[in-house]
C-alpha cells in the first residue's frame, strides 16, 4: 500500500514535467537561453573549477586525492540522485563506498526534519525574521543542525532566502526571513553558520527569482515563467542574500524551478558559471530543486553539479538526464571529463569540509512512512523491506529555543488604552478555530496541506511534523480559570456579554507550495487574497459589535489586510504571532499575560489596500503561453515602494510596539576603513585548482557489475553497451551558443566567497544608547537604514542594512548598541563597470536609526554630525 501510494504521487507529478529526450547525451535541450522582451542571459562558459580559495584548500586536497582514483561510475554516482522515493530521504545520491563515502542523504525542511518523528517543529523563517535577533537566528541553526545530524542527514535543504517577498501573495514567502535583502541575508547567514557548526551541509535556496508558485515548473505544454530581472536589480536585491550566504561558507546552492531572462535556472550559465561560481566565488556544489532539471548536457556545462532527486522530468520509469546518460555523455565526449571531475570534487570537498568523513551517522528514519518497517525503496514496484524508522529522539531541550523565538517574534501592532497585557483574572471570551486544535488530529494533513486549528506553519515541503502542539486554547485555559472558548469561525448568537469582558479573536491567513491546493489556493494566495481565511474579518467585526474590548491575534504567512476592522473603537489591540511552530500556545501566553513584553517587529509592510503595491508584483496566470514576469518595479519592493510613492501603509516595515517605551540617545559614527576610491581595490588572484587527467575513461568503468541485483527505478551510472557509447562522436552535439572550453578572465567583482573581500571591509560603525523609559522590562530593536547620495544615481531613499537587539532592560536601564556596515552596504552595482561603486570616503551618506522604517530616532551624516530626532 505504501509503494502504491508512492507511485501514485509520482504519477501526479507527470502533468507538471517535461518529456525527457530519448538520449539527452546527444539531443539539445528545449530550454536554451534566449532573449525575452529585452532581457537576456548571455552565455558564460566554461564552468569555473572550485578549490582556489585557501579557506577550502584542505578539503579540496582531500577530495582531489579521492577523486583522482575514482572510476567513472563512482563519479557519476555522487552527482545523481537515486530517484524519487528510492531511499529513506527526500533525496539521496549514489555512493562511493571504496572511499568511505555513503549515499548522501538530503532532507527538508528549513524549520525541522520533514516527515520524521521525535524532532522539533521550529517557528518558520518569517517568524525568525520578526525577532530581529541574530543570536536566536544562530541558535535555531545550531539546533536544526544537531537534529538533522542526529537523524543521519548529510544535507539540510535550507535556509530559504528566495522568494524574497516581492509578491505579497506569494505562496512560500513565509519560509524566508522577510521582504528585505539585508534581513534575508542576515537571517540566512546566521542559520547557515549554525547548521554547519554541527557538520551538516546547509543549502541556500531557491536561486533565483522564484517569486510565485503558479507556473513555476515547465511542463509538457508550457514553459515555466521567466523572471525578467535587470542586472542592477538582480545584484542589489535578489542576489544580496545569496552572496551573504556564500560568504558564510554555505556548502550547497539549490536552483529555482523558474527561468530567469528566458533561461532555466538549473542550466543558466550566466547565473551559475559567471555570477555564482566566478563572481561570488562559490566553492560548494549546485543542485536542482526536485525535478527541476530540464536537460542533461546543457545543465552540466552551465554549472550544475548534482541532479535531485535524479529522475528525468517524468519520474515514472527510472529515466534520467544524468545517471547512465551522464556516463554516456562522458564517453562520447559531449561533456568534458574536466567538468565531471569538478562536479564530483565540489561534492566530495564539501563533505570533507563539514567533517562528515568522521563519525557521522547513517539515516535512521524514513520520510516515506511512520511505520517501523517497510520497503527500502518505496518508489519501486517490488522492494526489499526492513527496518526504516528507529525513532531516534533528537529534540533535546530545543523546545526552549523554539518557544523563545515564537515569543520574541510576537509583534504588537496596536495597544489602545494599554489593554495588554491581560490580567489572569480578566473575564475572557475566546473566538476562532485558529485558537484550537486540528479537529482531524495532529499531523492529519500531509505536509500541513490544510488550515485547521491554530496555524503553526504554511504548507508544502518547507514543513515538518509536529511532535506535539500546545494550542492557544490549552495555554490560556492553563493560566485563566475565567475564560470561555468558542472554537468556531462563525460568531455565536448566544454569547453572554458582561461589561468587563475581553474578547480575544483568533484569525489566520495561510499559503504554501504549489503541489498542494488548499481551499482554492494553489500555493499562492489566489482565492483568499490578503484577507483572513475562514470568515476572519467578519468574526472580528461581529465580536467588536458585541464587546467593548477586543484583542485580535493573527497567525499569518505574511501581510494581511485589516481595514475592515482595525479602526473600530472596540478593537483595542492587535498581536501578530506569525507562524510559531509547536510552541504556539505557550509563546503567546508569555506575552498576552505580561510575563514578557513583546519585542517582535514586522518583517514586511502591512498595506491599507492591495492596490497600494505596484501592479507588477501581482500574481500572473496565463495558460499555455510562457509567462513573462518582468520586474519593472526594479529595486522598489515592499517598504521601498511605499516610500518612493509616498504611500502611508497601515503598519510599516519594522513596526512593533512594546509594553514599555525606549529612547535613543548619544548616537556616534566612527570611520573604520577609509574609502579612498569609488571602486574596491583590485581583487586577489585565483589560487590553483585541482588537476586531473582529462582522458576519456575506459568504457568498462561503467559496465554493469557481474551478478548485480538491480532495483527497478533506481538510478545507476551503468550502461548496457558502454563500448558502443564510447564510439559516438561529440561533434554532432549541438552545443549552446557561446560555448567554449577556454576559461574566462576572473571577474573584477570577485576574489573570495561572496565577492571581492574588500567589499566586506567595515567602513563605518554607529553606536547608540537605548534606554528603557517605561515602567516594565523589555527589549528594543535598533534598525539601521542607509540613505545614499544622489551622486550614485537613483536609489531607494532608505535601505535596511543592519539591526541590533538589546538584552532585557529593566525600567531606567540602558544599553549601548554598536552596528557595523561595510563598503558594499553603501554601494550600488555599476552595470557598465560590473563592480560595486561607493561614494568616495562615504561622502553624502546618511545613516538613520529607528524602531521602524517610518519611526526614526537618530541620524548621522558621514563627514558631519549625529543627532537625535
Curated annotation (Swiss-Prot):
Using the UniProt annotation, give the residues that carry a glycan (glycosylation sites).
69, 77, 261, 332, 364, 399, 425, 478, 728
What is the catalytic activity of this protein? Answer: Hydrolysis of terminal, non-reducing beta-D-glucosyl residues with release of beta-D-glucose
Catalytic residues (positions): 289
Q: Where is this region: Disordered?
A: 678-698
Q: Which stretch is the leader sequence?
A: 1-19
Q: In which pathway does it act?
A: Glycan metabolism; cellulose degradation
UniProt lists the family membership as follows:
Belongs to the glycosyl hydrolase 3 family.
Q: What is this protein called?
A: Probable beta-glucosidase F
Q: Which organism is it from?
A: Neosartorya fischeri (strain ATCC 1020 / DSM 3700 / CBS 544.65 / FGSC A1164 / JCM 1740 / NRRL 181 / WB 181) (Aspergillus fischerianus)
Q: In the UniProt record, what gene is named as encoding this protein? A: bglF
